[in-house]
Amino acid sequence: DLKELVETGVTPIMYYDAMGRLIKTKMPDGTLSRTEFDSWKQVIYDANDTVLESESSWYHNRTNHLIDAELIAAGKDPNREKMAADKAAKHARTPSIQHFDTLGRPVLLVDHNKNLVTDADEFYLTKVNLDIESNLRSVIDARGNVVMQYKYDILGNKIYQSSMDAGQRWLLINILGNPLRTWDERNHEFQYLYDILHRPTQS
């Protein structure tokens, strides 16, 4: 905890719970991030979310001009640093939340934002669909768009994917799981050849 040691280099202080999970990280600049664990969800607070908390000195030091001399010595403008602190405070208490299913898998992601004009809370939900073997089947964004969709063979190998941006793509693999042929809906096709020792020789 010596000031000279903490201020030299990057020395985050990390805290863990009894199960070995990272629950809090304190950074040398006074910012703080933490994670809350629950049976059905996980709440993630980044440095902006905790900026107004008593343990986070980053905002307090800049808005009250307590470290102006240090900032100037580091080539920074204290007034601009205060402006940055005030802007960061608008994002305070807006953690991200992951909701779990009965198998402990994340299936719903909630991004908590604030309207900069009205300061009203806004929540954006991303849904994740998994099959019984925990293979990712689809991702649906806050507007209801199917961003990604996947299909698998009986062994769990991915053989098809559909992207909202890149379109559809298929994959044919051999018995060892190595790709033999890939193609997409734009008629781009790739073939892969191997020698008798299953080393790639041509594509």
Stretches found by the model and what they are:
Residues 1-203:
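Acidic, low-complexity segments
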